Regions:
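Conserved phosphate/pyrophosphate-binding and hydrolysis machinery centered on Walker-type P-loop NTPases
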Residues: 263-267, 304, 350, 506-507, ...
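Conserved adenine-nucleotide phosphate-binding loops and their immediately adjacent elements
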Residues: 286-299
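ATPase/helicase motor core of nucleic-acid motors
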Residues: 400-414, 534-535, 542, 549-550, ...
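Pre-Walker A adenine-sensing motif
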Residues: 299-317
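N-terminal accessory nucleic-acid engagement/regulatory domains that precede
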Residues: 1-287
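Short aromatic-glycine-enriched beta-strand elements
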Residues: 565-569
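Conserved helicase motor core of P-loop NTPases
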Residues: 309-311, 421-552, 556-560
Length: 572
């Protein structure tokens, strides 16, 4: 339920392993040859579907039916059936009467308990009659995950959803599963297609297409001609809008205008944010330029002419500043200089992620400063009026979060910092890339000089990549920055070097490559749960407030000693 991408490991099997339910498995450790080296791998030699008791407890609570006992023959026979057949419970309850009846009879002839099939019978009856809640049941039967179901369970039967114990917030998914979510859960399109027919749901698919185009491609307005293959766009949009529950109409409605279609809420949020920023432009601080000039003369640590020019100009005419720049161009350094200048003023530093917040906290040691993530800043911004607020990582802040923040934020000066080429916000966020085009040009500052490398050819490569120069590959080849992948990557040339991987999973993912590299460590292996640790292994700490500030995100170290006991393990 709480698995981390850092804690997954890859196993191999000659069989197609069921992907929807929890399984029990046995695996053996062995090796394969890759790049003239031995890579440790794990191979599954036996497995069985084993939906956990907590998941059947959730299922029974949703149906308001007696609990299914995982110790019964009925339960174990069903797990055996799911393992051998490879079917899902959704497929089983939607089978013909003859097939379903045969499976039910075979299992019940072996068992005295019938709680499981009583629950499946109720699901089958609701699904076959297409009753309210049937699409939710189809999906739950497919997934049966505690981390999904626990958020859907209401404390009493809901008459709007066939008296199932489900919250009203589940209703949008039941009505339009191809373009709605459950409570705290966004089903994948693959899973939806696996359990619900798309016939007659073209209006949902149209809305989903527009939403994905907006959120993932940052394309607020989609040309109608791009989605005409789905059907009559105007008719589908009207059908979608009429099926929305009333509180979602201002946010999710599809709007057609000038041969374009867009989602009303996304457009409205963008306009709201831009208008709010325009209202904050102001007229600057009286005497700021002279005061900053004096401070710069007395502060020899500011030795960059680019930053001096920006600092002199920043609040001389306006109360708002936007700072754009790639990694390593000195955005944080500029924030540090401003913080020092405003040392006696109240300051709030906000970032979208905890690592970025902690980085600011470590870098900026100035009095009258508070630090927070945007998600946790309400206690700080509600009712408070700061002299200056800094918001870092702006390109990763989605529109909805920024709109809500600006509603509550009271400050004399506002500094927005980010890189439009950085990883985008998870949800739709176009405000930071658009803001510069709607605000006075002389409140927008761009840092262009990278300071993390003085190697001119590396800087040139960086510039080509950022500008999507079509000659980038040619330049990489000329400078010999790329080579054939071979076993030289496993020869350590520096104690602090790393290998970058494209993902966490798979044969060449971070987790598997870590095991590959660990194989070179000749220290004795210490086994704990499904993991192997060795003295001398390098470690990196992920987000953990348990020992902050002694241990912080991305802190690096090495295992020097391991003490293993019966129920505990200690690392030095």
């Amino acid at each position: 339920d709480y698995s981390s991408k850092f804690n997954r490991f890859t196993v191999f099997s000659k069989n197609e392993i069921p992907i929807y339910y929890a399984i029990k498995l046995n695996f053996i450790d062995t090796e394969i040859g890759i790049l003239k080296r031995h890579m440790p791998i794990r191979v599954i030699d036996n497995y069985k579907v084993a939906i956990r008791p907590v998941e059947f407890d959730d299922f029974s609570r949703i149906l308001n039916m007696p609990k299914v006992n995982a110790g019964t023959i009925e339960y174990n026979s069903m797990m055996e059936y799911l393992t051998v057949s490879g079917m899902s419970l959704t497929e089983l309850v939607t089978m013909s009467d003859e097939y379903y009846g045969a499976v039910k009879t075979e299992i019940q002839n072996l068992s005295r308990s019938n709680n499981l099939f009583n629950s499946l019978d109720k699901c089958r009856q609701l699904i076959k009659s297409n009753a309210a809640g049937s699409n939710i049941l189809r999906y739950i039967l497919l997934k049966m995950r505690h981390r999904i179901m626990r958020y859907q369970i209401a404390d009493r039967p809901n008459n709007w959803i066939s008296y199932l114990c489900l919250w009203n917030e589940c209703i949008p998914f039941d009505r339009m599963p191809f373009d709605a979510s459950l409570v705290y859960h966004n089903p994948s399109l693959f899973d939806i297609f696996s359990c619900i027919s798309s016939k007659g749901r073209e209006h949902e698919i149209l809305s989903r297409k527009i939403r994905i185009n907006t959120e993932q491609n940052i394309k607020l307005f989609t040309p109608i001609k791009d989605v005409e293959y789905i059907g009559n766009v105007e008719e589908l949009a009207n059908k979608f809008n009429t099926l929305l529950i009333s509180k979602h109409v201002p946010v999710r409605s599809l709007v057609i205008e000038k041969d374009k279609v867009y989602i009303k809420g996304y457009e409205a949020d963008t306009v709201t944010i831009i208008n709010d920023l325009i209202s904050r432009v102001g007229k600057g601080l009286a005497g700021y330029r002279n005061a900053m000039g004096t401070w710069l003369q007395e502060t020899p640590t500011v030795d960059c002419e680019e930053k001096k020019s920006i600092l002199l100009d920043m609040f001389s005419k306006y109360d708002l500043a936007l700072i754009y720049g790639a990694a390593g161009t000195g955005k944080t350094t500029l924030i540090k200089h401003l913080s020092s200048y405003f040392a006696d003023s109240s300051k709030l530093f906000l970032a979208n992620t905890n690592p970025a917040k902690e980085n600011l906290r470590r870098q900026i040691k100035v009095s009258n400063s508070e630090f927070s993530t945007i998600a946790s800043c309400s206690p700080l911004v509600n009712g408070n009026n700061y002299d200056i607020v800094f918001i870092d990582e702006c390109s990763t802040v989605d529109n909805a979060a920024m709109k809500e923040l600006l509603k509550k934020l009271n400050c004399r000066l506002l500094v927005l910092v980010g890189d439009v080429y950085q990883i985008r916000s998870i949800k739709f966020g176009n405000w930071f890339s658009l803001a510069r085009y709607f605000l006075p040009s002389n409140i927008v500052y761009e840092l262009n000089t990278p300071y993390r490398s003085k190697h001119s050819s590396m800087v040139e490569l960086w510039n080509k990549v950022r500008s999507l120069d079509e000659r980038t590959e040619e330049y990489i080849a000329i400078q010999h920055y790329a080579s054939e992948l071979d076993d030289s990557i496993f020869v350590r040339e520096d104690s602090d070097e790393i290998i970058l991987c494209l993902n966490y999973d798979g044969l060449y993912g971070i987790n598997n490559i870590n095991r590959f590299l660990q194989n070179d460590n000749q220290s004795p292996a210490v086994y704990w749960d499904s993991w192997i640790y060795k003295v001398g292994d390098p470690v990196i700490f992920s987000e953990n407030n348990r020992f902050y500030p002694t241990l912080y995100n991305n802190l690096k170290g090495w295992i020097r000693h391991i003490k293993k006991e019966t129920a505990a393990i200690q690392f030095d």
